[in-house]
C-alpha cells in the first residue's frame, strides 16, 4: 500500500527529506490508524515559509502567527467515493526553529510533524487533555516503529 502524496515546495528550503521519507512517514501513520488499512489515499503536503503559514493560520484559525503544521481534511460529499484525505501545510522555518529550541534532530521533527498532521487528517485532535494524551500515545507508537524516540520527553 502506497498512498499518493502531492509534495509541493512553495519556499526555498536548504535541505528536505526525500519523497521516499515522506512516503514512509505517511504510510506508517495511516497503517496504524486506518479503518481500511489496504485502501490507498491521496494527500497534499505543502512546504511553506512563515508568511504563507501565518496567512493561512490567520484565515482559518484566527491566529496571526505562523505555525508548524496545519491540517485541512477533505470532506467528501455524500454519495461520492474519493480517497482524498486532505492537505498538510508545514512551515519549514517554524519547524526548524522548534527542532533547534527543543534540541531535536531535524529529521525526527520532520517525521513527527508529518505524522501529527496525518492524524489530524483522519480525525484526531488535541483540544482536551484526554484527546491530547491519546494522540500523543499514537504518535509515539508510530515514531517507535520508525526507530524515532519519543518527542514528548524532555531533551
From Swiss-Prot:
Source organism, top-level taxon: Bacteria
Positions annotated to bind Zn(2+): 116, 120, 126
The record's section on PROSITE patterns has: UPF0054
UniProt cross-references to Pfam families, sorted A to Z:
YbeY
Q: Which cofactor does it need?
A: Zn(2+)
Instruction: Spell out the GO cellular component terms annotated for this protein, sorted alphabetically and separated by semicolons.
Output: cytoplasm
The note on cofactor binding and number reads: Binds 1 zinc ion.
From the Swiss-Prot or TrEMBL record, state where the protein is found.
Answer: Cytoplasm
Check the record and name the PANTHER family matching this protein. Answer: ENDORIBONUCLEASE YBEY, CHLOROPLASTIC (PTHR46986:SF1)
Known NCBIfam families for this protein?
rRNA maturation RNase YbeY
What is the annotated role of this protein in its UniProt record? Single strand-specific metallo-endoribonuclease involved in late-stage 70S ribosome quality control and in maturation of the 3' terminus of the 16S rRNA.
What is the protein name for this chain?
Endoribonuclease YbeY
* Species of the source: Colwellia psychrerythraea (strain 34H / ATCC BAA-681) (Vibrio psychroerythus)
